[in-house]
Design a protein with these regions (language model features):
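Charged, amphipathic alpha-helical segments and their flanking helix caps
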Residues: 1-23, 28, 45-149
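Extended compositionally biased segments used for macromolecular assembly or nucleic-acid engagement
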Residues: 35-37
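Short, low-order "capping/linker" segments at domain edges
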Residues: 41-43
């Protein structure tokens, strides 16, 4: 498992995801252009700090793209509320340990927290608003990896 797998599982387990996700599948690095599809894109990983024992604290950046119905204000408000509530839920995730494969070794990893920013509409998916709107939310996952040694 990687931090990408971990966050995909967390987002899929969001209690209200079934209201907006047709087949409970979040694509990786792309999304279908039809409403209600989601894609989780990994935008980089960086080292925040490393202690003397080799324990690394890292930050992984994601963008969740969501294609939502947009026929009327009710749909657009539901989409915006979904992103708002998802952001709040993600920011309240508890620390959790999991095993991550690092260079062929199983390494103890601890998810620390998720933060979110910039939940917004990105534009039309077709020529009219009836074709759906793409929304995005940026997600940052902070996690620790124990030393590989």
């Amino acid at each position: 498992m990687t931090i990408i797998d971990f966050m995909r599982e967390k987002i899929t387990s969001y209690p209200k995801i079934s209201e907006f996700l047709i087949n409970n599948d979040i694509h990786i690095d792309f999304t279908e252009p039809e409403p209600t599809n989601y894609g989780l894109s990994s935008n980089g990983d960086r080292l925040l700090k490393e202690d003397l024992l080799g324990v690394q604290t890292r930050k992984h950046n994601f963008v969740l793209y969501a294609i939502g119905q947009s026929i009327n204000d009710y749909n657009r408000l539901a989409n915006s509320n979904f992103l708002y509530e998802l952001a709040h839920w993600l920011e309240h995730l508890q620390e959790e340990e999991f095993t991550m494969d690092v260079n062929g070794k199983d390494v103890k990893t601890t998810f620390i927290e998720a933060t979110t920013e910039n939940a917004m509409s990105m534009g039309l998916m077709g020529e009219t608003i009836n074709d759906g709107i793409m929304y995005q939310i940026q997600i940052y996952a902070i996690y620790k990896i124990e030393s590989e040694d």
